[in-house]
């Protein structure tokens, strides 16, 4: 294994082929992250990230004169990017699943999109607040109808409704 510091320095000086040597050094790590992810394009995402990482690498810092610090920096950066991409992929998968469920219920696309946006907006509310807002805005029920359905007073429904709207406003 050649000196990683020198390889990065040469790459920054214009020796483009050095990036391939650097990628080869970290190929086992990229393969490990690929195996540990259910996202098919994880290796290519991390490879592209690594290009950007090497382009912006702070070689002028004294601590990066030794390979062990460079390797640790690249490893931690790749690991953080791996976590970020995995979380994003899981969120997309979750939305795809929700969309599939809603699609089965014969909703048109505009309704589907507004439902997904609505669910994203109310995600931080309590379950009771979410339930009441869904009944009011998605199902078109009045507060009195909701109160009869939930066996609570209309004032309690109104209070929960206003509290939820206030939370969303802030």
Swiss-Prot record:
Pfam families to which the protein is assigned, alphabetical = Sigma70_r4
Q: What's one GO BP annotation on this UniProt entry?
A: DNA-templated transcription initiation
Q: Does the keyword Hydrolase apply?
A: no
Residues of the region (Sigma-70 factor domain-4) are 122-169
> Upon deletion of the gene, what happens?
Cells lacking tcsR grow normally but display reduced toxin production.
Q: Which GO terms describe its molecular function?
A: DNA binding; sigma factor activity
- Keyword DNA-binding carried by entry: yes
Residue ranges of DNA binding: 143-162
SUPFAM superfamilies given in the database record = Sigma3 and sigma4 domains of RNA polymerase sigma factors
Sorted alphabetically, the keyword list is:
DNA-binding, Sigma factor, Transcription, Transcription regulation
For this chain, the family text in UniProt reads: Belongs to the sigma-70 factor family.
Report the function annotation for this chain: Sigma factors are initiation factors that promote the attachment of RNA polymerase to specific initiation sites and are then released. Transcriptional regulator specifically required to activate expression of the toxin gene locus, composed of tcsL and tcdE/utxA.
Q: What is this protein called?
A: RNA polymerase sigma factor TcsR
Taxonomic lineage is: Bacteria, Bacillati, Bacillota, Clostridia, Peptostreptococcales
């Amino acid at each position: 294994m050649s000196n990683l510091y020198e390889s990065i320095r040469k790459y920054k000086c214009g020796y483009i082929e050095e990036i391939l040597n650097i990628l080869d050094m970290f190929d086992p790590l990229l393969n490990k992250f690929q195996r540990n992810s259910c996202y098919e394009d994880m290796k290519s995402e991390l490879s592209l990230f690594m290009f950007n990482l090497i382009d912006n690498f702070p070689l002028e810092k004294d601590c990066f004169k030794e390979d062990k610090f460079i390797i640790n920096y690249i490893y931690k950066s790749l690991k953080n990017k791996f976590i970020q991409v995995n979380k994003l992929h899981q969120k997309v998968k979750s939305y795809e699943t929700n969309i599939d469920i809603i699609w089965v219920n014969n909703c048109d696309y505009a309704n589907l999109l507004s439902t997904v946006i609505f669910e994203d907006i109310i995600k931080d509310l309590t379950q009771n607040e979410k339930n009441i807002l869904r009944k009011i805005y998605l199902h078109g029920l009045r507060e009195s109808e909701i109160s009869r359905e939930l066996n609570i007073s209309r004032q309690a429904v109104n209070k929960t409704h206003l509290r939820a709207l206030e939370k969303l406003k802030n």
